[in-house]
């Protein structure tokens, strides 16, 4: 394990950090924030940079390509042949970036990578540029240690910050090559601090609903209609209360799940960890 740690530390300084720094220098914004994303070549440049870096890491059985269809965003698609296992692992990340807000601290800028106190500052480094570098390095270490792994598929999209408009399309169109994953890792979550590797077990979901309430066939003056015609907002509030009680904050049973005891135990351990910190 000591030698493995030394190897990873060396790779980080010699290859990963320089690769991430070069990635930061590319101002490839998510399509929602760049109307010329399909013609200015920035997304293509960033995607090819990631692919070229990955192919240089010596991972056995790796095939990589930048998938692009007209009118759709770019997708870094990497396949790694199985070695001693018939399982399939799907890993996800994204390489598009949110728009910068200028120089938010002295000496720091969006496309100017700066290492300060052992931390890399630059737009898109942690959200979510690190993903491919972490994935490939992990697989490289497994192979160097003689470990076995199943078929590995890596998908790094370029539209996450714009709502992932093409992710489902690409997953379907490439399903024949992806197969049926036995496990999936999403390399795009948060962390409590930078002293450990954090694993997110679950996130709260969201349901988007478009609701239109009509009470009258034609408009009436509020001075004569109020109190007689039902108020549309009141009707909407009643409807929402059927799902989420505004008085008790309880949601309807079909939308609620029981929290497993082991997750409650995890939360308590996390609270103890934060208290110690």
Which residue stretches match the model-derived regions?
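Active-site-proximal alpha-helical scaffold in enzymes
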Residues: 129-145, 164-172, 230-242
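Active-site metal-coordination/substrate-binding segment of hydrolases
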Residues: 86-156
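Conserved active-site and cofactor/substrate-binding residues in soluble primary-metabolism enzymes
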Residues: 11, 15, 41, 45, ...
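Acidic-enriched catalytic cores of C-N bond-cleaving enzymes acting on peptides and small amides
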Residues: 177, 192, 201, 222-277
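N-terminal helical capping/dimerization or prosegment-like subdomains
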Residues: 1-103
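Generic secondary-structure signature for well-ordered alpha-helical cores
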Residues: 25, 55, 144, 175-176, ...
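Histidine/acidic-residue-rich, glycine-tolerant segments that coordinate divalent metal ions
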Residues: 149-230
């Amino acid at each position: 394990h000591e030698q493995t740690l030394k190897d990873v530390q060396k790779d980080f300084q010699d290859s990963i950090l320089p690769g991430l720094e070069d990635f930061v220098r590319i101002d490839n914004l998510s399509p929602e924030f760049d109307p010329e994303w399909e013609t200015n070549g920035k997304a293509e440049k960033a995607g090819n940079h990631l692919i070229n870096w990955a192919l240089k890491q010596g991972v056995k059985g790796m095939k990589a390509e930048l998938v692009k269809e007209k009118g759709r965003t770019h997708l870094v698609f990497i396949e790694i042949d199985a070695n001693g296992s018939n399982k399939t692992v799907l890993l996800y990340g994204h390489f598009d970036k949110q728009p910068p807000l200028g120089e938010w601290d002295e000496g720091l800028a969006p496309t100017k990578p700066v290492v300060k106190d052992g931390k890399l500052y630059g737009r898109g480094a942690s959200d979510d540029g690190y993903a491919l570098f972490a994935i490939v390095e992990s697989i490289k270490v497994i192979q160097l240690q003689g470990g076995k792994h199943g078929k590995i598929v890596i998908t790094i999209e370029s539209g996450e910050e714009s709502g992932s408009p093409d992710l489902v399309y690409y997953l379907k169109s490439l399903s024949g090559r992806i197969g049926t994953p036995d496990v999936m890792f999403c390399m795009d979550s948060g962390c409590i601090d930078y002293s450990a590797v954090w694993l997110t077990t679950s996130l709260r979901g969201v349901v988007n609903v478009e609701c239109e309430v009509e009470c009258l066939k034609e408009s009436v003056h509020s001075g004569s209609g109020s109190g007689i015609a039902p108020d549309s907002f009141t009707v909407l509030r009643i409807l929402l209360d059927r799902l989420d009680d505004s008085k008790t904050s309880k949601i309807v049973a079909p939308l609620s799940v029981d929290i497993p005891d082991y997750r409650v135990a995890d939360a308590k351990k996390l609270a103890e960890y934060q208290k110690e910190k």
